[in-house]
């Protein structure tokens, strides 16, 4: 398994959520078809991610797949469920390993209210381990609209390619961090995602001082 160096990750405001009971986590693993002994780490919480008063179960699980090849030895999955009595009913799933082409690790969940409406959006973090010389942590931001859950933004929140001399062109050997600008994002009612990008190195050369730039990304269409 590829080694993962300690990374500084994006600072996101995580809303207070109810910690899931141990039996809820076990129910999630069972629903996913994952044995408890294969779970490397997990984030399981209850939060309101759909309109209405009811809370849903949101889980990100990092687990051993049982596959022998390095690319697919670990899996990272996000699943969202509603509860029906004692049952968990699947609503949405995101397989980070499938989307990334394997080589994933250290999945985590963040519960975020990006538009201030009281219904939270979902963030799933994971490490991209495709290249030993590139340290990258990624984030998918998932929103819910009339069409259901969808990935509204996906990108790197921590990236360092300064050591990848052979694999990455010189002009892409950057190092940076991204941090959510929650206040500005909420001012747009979640239509635009604001990020502060801190550049530490550019084209393989460390900057004398880190440089911050503001980035914007579309999240939701403007309401008529």
Language model: regions and residue ranges:
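"Short basic amphipathic alpha-helical interaction patches in structured regions
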Residues: 72-81, 125, 135-142
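N-terminal secretory signal peptides that target proteins for export/translocation
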Residues: 1-2
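Acidic/hydrophobic-patterned starts of short beta strands in beta-sheet-rich repeat architectures
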Residues: 48-63, 113-128, 179-197
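Bacterial N-terminal signal peptides
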Residues: 6-16
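Terminal domain-start segments
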Residues: 19-103, 203-224
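Repeated scaffold domains used in trafficking and secretory/extracellular systems
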Residues: 42-45, 102-110, 162-165
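Extracellular-facing segments of soluble proteins and assemblies that are Gly/Ser/Thr-biased and enriched
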Residues: 96-133
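Acidic, small-residue rich beta-repeat scaffolds with periodic aromatic anchors
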Residues: 19-37, 129-224
């Amino acid at each position: 398994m590829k080694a993962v160096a300690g990374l500084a990750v994006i600072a996101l405001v995580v809303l207070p959520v109810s910690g899931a009971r141990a039996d809820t986590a076990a129910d999630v693993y069972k629903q996913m078809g994952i044995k408890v002994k294969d779970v490397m780490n997990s984030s399981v919480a209850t939060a309101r991610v759909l309109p209405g008063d009811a809370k849903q179960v949101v889980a990100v699980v990092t687990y051993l797949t049982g596959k022998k090849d390095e690319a697919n030895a670990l899996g990272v999955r996000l699943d969202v469920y509603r509860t029906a009595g004692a049952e968990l009913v699947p609503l949405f799933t995101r397989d980070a390993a499938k989307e990334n082409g394997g080589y994933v690790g250290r999945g985590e969940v963040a519960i975020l209210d990006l538009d201030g409406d009281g219904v939270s959006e979902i963030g799933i973090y994971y490490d991209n381990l495709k290249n030993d010389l590139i340290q990258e942590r990624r984030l998918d931001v998932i929103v819910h609209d009339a069409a259901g859950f969808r990935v509204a933004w996906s990108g790197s929140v921590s990236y360092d390619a300064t050591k990848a001399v052979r694999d990455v062109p010189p002009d892409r050997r950057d190092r940076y961090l991204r941090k959510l600008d929650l206040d500005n994002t909420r001012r747009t009612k979640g239509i635009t995602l604001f990020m502060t990008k801190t550049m530490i190195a550019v084209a393989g050369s460390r900057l004398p001082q880190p440089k911050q730039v503001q980035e914007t990304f579309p999240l939701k269409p403007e309401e008529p």
